[in-house]
Amino acid sequence: MNMSCKFEIVLLVSWWLLLVLVFGVESSMFSEFDRLDFPKHFIFGASSCAYQVEGAAFEDGRTLSTFDIAAHSGHLPGNGDITSDEYHKYKEDVELMVETGLDAYRFSISWSRLIPNGRGPVNPKGLEYYNNLVNALLTKGTQPHVTLLHSDLPQALRDEYGGLFISPKFIDDFVAYADVCFREFGDRVLHWTTFNEANFLAFGDENTPASALYLSAHHLLLAHASATRLYRENYQASQRGFIGINVYAYDFIPETNTEVDVIAAKRARDFFIGWFVQPLMNGEYPLTMRKNGGPRLPKFTPNETELLTGSYDFIGLNYYTAKTVKDDPVMLTVEPRNYYTDQGLISSYLGNIDPYQGHPFFNTPWGLHDVLQQFKQVYGNPPVYIHENGEVGDHDADYDKLINDIPRVEYLQGHIRAVLDAVRNGSNVKGYFVWSFLDMYELMYGTKFTFGLYYIDFNDPKLTRHPKLSQKWYSRFLKGEKASTKASIHTPNEAETHTYFY
């Protein structure tokens, strides 16, 4: 065998090893697959959020939420006053879900629509709307997956608390609100999520000081665990449903292969994901947080530890892209110390772009696979739903480009394939939801950048829903057509690292 042949073999083996590291199976990113490759009861759906999709912000007894105030005070671009108007068009949207072939629709309940003052009497019109939506979905064979709080706290409660989640009063108020939802809808809703992106929720709003983040998270965790206990004690046996929490997840990868960056990437995971997931496993914050946070990090009492441990039937994950992490010990010398400085690191989006300024997410399905491997190996392989995953697009682009959203198709293909590979490698993934079903008001972008499978011209009074190429692809996939992942995927090379860790 000559040297040229040896070099070619070494090169081929190197590429194969990279594919195994990234996807866990040999060259799977180039193979076809279909939904029958997934487990029999695997759920495919799409997601939304009450404030972002419903509209009717000032109708039928709904009162102001924190999102309304943030939007109308200029802290968010635009507002959700009308947005996609699903409040009035839910029947049409349910028909579109059936046409698409969704197994499930994940939506949230507007607390300020159901209980306008945050506590006290239930709004009959709000109750009627959510009953109608749930019934319409079930009539068409679509499962409702319901989130109790997608960040939009009633403004009346925020005013009373003096901040979003800094008051322990929030715990009892949330449990009382959850009780109403379980009682009124639990005979038909079998999948409940307490909080969407609980780790981001803890960051509060523009008025939340960095010193308050630990306390906010503490109250959110105790509110989740208390609502879970209520559900299990009073409802689960008869309603036979499931309850969990949702967190936002990045794949944190070290900027270099140095030991300090590898450790820093693990620390980033502990401070962002483990912050909310680890207490559900053993009733304690991650060791790195306890060490670096010191007295700033609240401690759980023995009763709270018992309450938290095992307080989930599933974990929901929202995943869009990966971030690189660099160790920065100088952060640990900054005073006063807080959640951010305690991490001792700097994290950056791949390519140093900021997707929250409208740049497309780097297409990193390998990162989703990596996160699922972490949940299997670090957190005991709990049941997981991918609750949000999707690609942002410029809503101001020309119509043909908006409708023929090839980058979104490539993004979805790659990430669904990554989920399949994770399942085959033993990850306990139960379902996948696209973000989002419709173009709608986005909290970071207004209506300038959107994620929907259906295009909506927000200047059209009829708000007509137009299927995009991504909707057609997803529908064909859900109905049995094979998909291929020969797509434009950003490789780990673009992060200048091949280090993967669990």
Curated annotation (Swiss-Prot):
It catalyses: cyanidin 3-O-beta-D-glucoside + 1-O-(trans-sinapoyl)-beta-D-glucose = cyanidin 3,5-di-O-beta-D-glucoside + (E)-sinapate. GO terms for cellular component: plant-type vacuole. Expressed in petals. Gene3D superfamilies: Glycosidases. Glycans are attached at residues 2, 303, 425. GO terms for molecular function: beta-glucosidase activity; cyanidin 3-O-glucoside 5-O-glucosyltransferase (acyl-glucose) activity; hexosyltransferase activity. Its EC number is 2.4.1.299. Belongs to the glycosyl hydrolase 1 family. This is Cyanidin 3-O-glucoside 5-O-glucosyltransferase (acyl-glucose). It comes from Dianthus caryophyllus.
